Amino acid sequence: MAAKEIIFSEKARSRMVYGVNLLANAVKATLGPKGRNVVLDKNFGSPIITKDGVSVAKEIELADKFENMGAQMLKEVASKTNDHAGDGTTTATVLAQALIREGCKAVAAGMNPMDLKRGIDKAVIAAVTELKKISKPTSDDKAIAQVATISANSDESIGNIIAEAMKKVGKEGVITIEEGTTLENELDVVEGMQFDRGYSSPYFINNQQSQIVELDNPYILLHDKKISNVRDLLTVLDAVAKESKQLLIVAEEVEGEALATLVVNNIRGIIKVCAVKAPGFGDRRKAMLEDMAVLTGGTVISEEVGLSLEKATTSHLGKAKKVRVSKENTTIIDGMGDNDAINGRVKQIKTQIEETTSDYDREKLQERVAKLAGGVAVIKVGAATEVEMKEKKARVDDALLATRAAVEEGVIPGGGVALIRVITAISNLKGANEDQTHGIQIALRAMEAPLREIVANAGEEPSVILNKVKEGKGNFGYNAATGEFGDMVNFGILDPTKVTRSALQNAASIAGLMITTEAMIAEAPKKDEPTPPAAGGGMGGMGGMDF
């Protein structure tokens, strides 16, 4: 086992705080509408220019092990806030730095670290309660666009495209972000349920120009096994043909004689039909077939529930207004399923989302909810260069997550104003003893830090602006982008409540741990091995003798 180096109390905390300050100073430069850029060097390719706090934090690794521990713990604040709320990483870093710096000073002055921690925790609990009181629900597209714009570093084009995407697919809809091929941002919306399986044979195509299959008001047959014998299908085909209806068959596979018969009947115009493979595999395939059944008001023909294909009737089939099938995708538009059944299915899947521990499963379940409840929107990010594309895509990701957070828990006035109003509301809070009360005061002072940093990055004097904002009430604050004072909501400067709440709670959590740290242990640096003495002069093979 390698030897360890151990440092204690003040020496440990000062090394840790040095690491915290290095990381925080790099990250907080990006805060606010006039935040600065940070350039990140990469081992290959061109450097990345970013204004995204979490991207900066992730890149930082310090040479000194004890300083690095402080930096890594602060990095945890940024990534935890980003994972939970999607934004607020820089705010969380600024809050944590202020709490740690003041807290460690108080410990050095002889205060009890445990009481300081209790005081900070007490202030944060009161602050979170106050934030919830200030919070207003996001009801309209304008508020959603404003939140997205702020999160995307004041880029209105990103804010508007996210608001439009949310309007089209609903709050439950899935919005995915891809790299575009043009200079402009684009939005593609897929209505209804789409899955990534195309037609089993190109002979089903009935729209030669678009090379797709279009079915109007078709019946939809859902089966969980392979279909190779045409006799199994005869009852259903006869019933559908008698009604002069069209038919979509979704099964594990349609092959051999069955596929050939369907193609021949389709070409002759006896019945307009298309066969596609069921999406997914195993249990996920069964679940997706059930989703389709609920959406279209049909039943999955499965031996597990005592239904066989040859005994199926039109009452077992689903219905939809329109179905489009291309080479790669099938889209079911306006399924005729019962709304209560669809809502029940959505609730059931949401319960599974809450219970699952796998990120992959959660993502797939959320996709299923979207396909049932809303739709899928794809935002294609446009940019002139690859460097700009990556930076812009990261901002769109942030903005989307922040917007979802705003829809979830509402919004508060942005620009650090909400925390200033919280300070005023809980300024009379007292602890059980003097040290706890000092901990509360540390937390209240730290809540000024985000506004101070936004103002400093805009090139103004933080104390002057802070005092003027403190004199105001409600939404009154400072718009760093224009240098004006006024109502932050009217300026369109809003923050999701969830983002500010998460930033404050995560910052206090790490600060509490650091303030109460008494010893730090790291692997001792290896001493360089002494180099062996060089061989003497003389001829080789002569033992270095000189002649």
Swiss-Prot record:
Binding site for ATP: 30-33, 51, 87-91, 415, 479-481, 495
Signal peptide: none
Location(s), subcellular: Cytoplasm
Location of the region described as Disordered in the Swiss-Prot/TrEMBL record: 526-547
MF (Gene Ontology): ATP binding; ATP-dependent protein folding chaperone; isomerase activity; unfolded protein binding
Residue spans of biased composition, Gly residues class: 535-547
Substrates-to-products reaction catalysed: ATP + H2O + a folded polypeptide = ADP + phosphate + an unfolded polypeptide
Record SUPFAM superfamilies: GroEL apical domain-like, GroEL equatorial domain-like, GroEL-intermediate domain like
Record-level GO BP terms: protein refolding
GO CC term (a single one): cytoplasm
Keyword list, A-Z: ATP-binding, Chaperone, Cytoplasm, Isomerase, Nucleotide-binding
EC assignment: 5.6.1.7
Record family assignment: Belongs to the chaperonin (HSP60) family.
Quaternary organization: Forms a cylinder of 14 subunits composed of two heptameric rings stacked back-to-back. Interacts with the co-chaperonin GroES.
NCBIfam families: GroEL, PRK00013.1, PRK12849.1, PRK12850.1, PRK12851.1
Functional note: Together with its co-chaperonin GroES, plays an essential role in assisting protein folding. The GroEL-GroES system forms a nano-cage that allows encapsulation of the non-native substrate proteins and provides a physical environment optimized to promote and accelerate protein folding.
Entry protein name: Chaperonin GroEL
Organism: Xylella fastidiosa (strain M12)
